Amino acid sequence: MSKVVVVYHSGYGHTQRMAQSVAQGADAELLAIDADGNLPEGGWDMLAAADAIIMGSPTYMGSASWQFKKFADASSKPWYSRAWADKVFAGFTNSASLNGDKLSTLHYFFTLAMQHSGVWVGSNVMPSNTKAAQRNDPNFLGSFAGAMAQSYVKKTNLDWSLEI
């Protein structure tokens, strides 16, 4: 049986909810990156033993969170020894906006996987782009590179008024 690890960072809990669903569907172990961008003890060993690594992060300012990027930069050690070569990779992300530049985050994950000589697996779920489609339909956002979700926020403190 294959061993799958879902490594993710979650800023406000939305990505954690996605990670839990992904892990349940893939019969995978969860590996959370903490608020300082670090893995828990034994985390690197979990990834070394995995056959597949599924990466998740919120999309902030058009890319993965800095905590995920810190993890990615630290993965240069397994890169140097080619420890993740031929592993299967996939990814998921979310943002508050309908678009939110989530594809940029998935491209970031893809590039990281390719640098590790991995094999990328996208989504085979057809987009729900019919007139009858609803926002909760599978693949409403139409992504083939990986899973995308829109995470609603309750309130924003941003003031978009512009005084000239």
Where are these predicted regions, by residue range?
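N-terminal beta1-alpha1-beta2 submodule of the flavodoxin-like/Rossmannoid cofactor-binding fold
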Residues: 1-84, 156-162
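Short glycine/serine/threonine-biased micro-segments
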Residues: 11, 50, 54, 60, ...
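Glycine-rich phosphate/pyrophosphate-binding loop and the adjoining helix
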Residues: 41-43, 124-164
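Generic structural "secondary-structure junction" signal
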Residues: 62-63, 81, 86, 94, ...
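Soluble or luminal CAZymes and related metallo-dependent hydrolases
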Residues: 67, 101, 105, 163-164
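Short, glycine-/small-residue-rich phosphate/pyrophosphate-handling segment
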Residues: 88-140
